């Protein structure tokens, strides 16, 4: 069986930047998980004593607080600034962008339609910057019962699928007088999605590596599953099962934006050992 990596996969700019910040901030604490990958979170804790707090209320005698890649709410930032703690901002610049857009557009009288998961920390953070109504949706059908205003600005969670975003935009363009569209899906997300789409259309088994709570990894898995029914989402090599690869000729591999290279390599090594023993 041949193993092929997607043309674009793994760590994105924002995650690489955040990891470097954390490694240079020994003994700091992150407000929430720095990234959605438990294995990398454990490595940072073990090697750099970077701890994870659930929220700001858990801050006690910590000297340094790191803001996670997904950002923080406007109120949370004000709370942090009121404390005697050094603030280290690891928010991805691509997440800061929709925060700024939402703050500006709402101040100009636009209500916000936000394509995203309402419980995701990135979405909570961006929402908090709006002074107007924010409609957080995953599907355009959720707007059918909403009395839409005459002015709307549309943004997306950075890790969502572009196809769905364009459907939502199209729906609004047909019903709202003035629609301002901001494509805030980041380039790394688009490139990884396009690469997994291409590979899964050829492979007869796909392995997507990443945190189960990672939005961008989940999107890669859904794209892959649609084109290659034998697609599997795993966090580490320990989840691989030999039966997935029996009688398969091409195994495609992709990984989420918060999946470190060492985890990906462990999966490839285990996969090669598994299939070698079986041959």
From Swiss-Prot:
The residues the record assigns to binding [4Fe-4S] cluster are 12, 92, 186
| EC number(s) reported in the record | 1.17.7.4
The UniProt annotation places (2E)-4-hydroxy-3-methylbut-2-enyl diphosphate binding at 36, 70, 120, 158, 214-216, 258
Q: What is this protein called?
A: 4-hydroxy-3-methylbut-2-enyl diphosphate reductase
This protein's source sits in the domain of life called Bacteria
The record's listing under PANTHER family reads: 4-HYDROXY-3-METHYLBUT-2-ENYL DIPHOSPHATE REDUCTASE
Q: Which organism is it from?
A: Campylobacter fetus subsp. fetus (strain 82-40)
* Co-factor(s): [4Fe-4S] cluster
């Amino acid at each position: 069986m041949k193993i092929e990596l997607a043309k674009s996969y793994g760590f994105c700019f924002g995650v690489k930047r955040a990891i470097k910040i954390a490694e240079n901030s020994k003994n700091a604490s992150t407000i929430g998980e720095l990234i959605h990958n438990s294995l990398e979170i454990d490595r940072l804790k073990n090697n750099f004593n970077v701890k994870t707090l659930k929220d700001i209320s858990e801050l006690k005698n910590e000297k340094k607080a790191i803001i996670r890649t997904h950002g923080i709410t406007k109120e949370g930032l004000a709370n942090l600034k009121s404390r005697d703690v050094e603030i280290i901002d690891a928010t991805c610049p691509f997440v800061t962008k929709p925060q700024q857009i939402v703050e500006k557009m709402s101040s100009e009288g636009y209500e916000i339609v936000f394509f995203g998961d309402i419980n995701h920390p990135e979405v909570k953070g961006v929402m908090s910057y709006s002074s107007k109504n924010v409609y957080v949706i995953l599907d355009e059908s959720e707007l059918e019962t909403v009395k839409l205003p005459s002015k709307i600005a549309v943004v997306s969670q950075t890790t969502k699928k572009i196809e769905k975003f364009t459907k939502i935009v199209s729906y609004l363009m047909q019903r709202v007088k003035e629609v301002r569209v901001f494509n805030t899906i980041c380039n790394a997300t688009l490139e990884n999605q396009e690469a997994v789409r291409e590979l899964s259309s050829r492979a007869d088994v796909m392995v997507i590596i990443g945190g189960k709570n990672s939005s961008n990894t989940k999107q890669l898995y859904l794209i892959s599953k649609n084109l290659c029914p034998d697609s599997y989402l795993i966090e580490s090599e320990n989840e691989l099962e030999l039966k997935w690869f029996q009688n398969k000729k091409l195994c495609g591999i992709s990984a989420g934006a918060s999946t470190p290279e060492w985890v990906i390599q462990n999966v490839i090594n285990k996969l090669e050992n598994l299939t070698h023993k079986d041959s």
